[in-house]
């Protein structure tokens, strides 16, 4: 039974290996030879008193039948919940990220012109115990981790790539309206009105707001992966800014 923090570390290396080689190859295909691509195994500190630990809500792993879920719960003391009518999955805590442990190294690499893959899977969740970092049984939300990373690197824009070109209010209804350019205040209003689904667009919009309001001039962009270029050019996507 591998600890969840170790599973995150393994997935960072596994996925990072493929991603960095794909990026390296694409750079070379474009005759760009002076940029190094590197994956940083990234630990992210969480608060052991975060309320999320008392209310696990993040589904992980494969879908199971009720009988399989009961067996896993008894065998490993997992918390299992029904998910979207497709079966049962394990749920774990999803605490807010507080500190990126390797931020100094990441910043040095970025400042030197390297292309850095960091905070994979939201980061390896750890709790500080004196000088020791203890792995936590949790999964950190990737959008919040990205917002924290962007703030720490003093980025101008946070780009959140997802499965749709723009965020929308009244999604999936006849009143559906795509959002192009909105202020932080408008985004907070839409969040309060419940327009964004938990576990889907809601954390993306919350992370976008968190970054956009963190300093003057910062903006967040939510768009489709295939439309990233057009989004950066201001031609599509949902852009969130302070005023």
Label each region the model flagged.
Residues 1-243:
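C-terminal catalytic "cap/lid" subdomain
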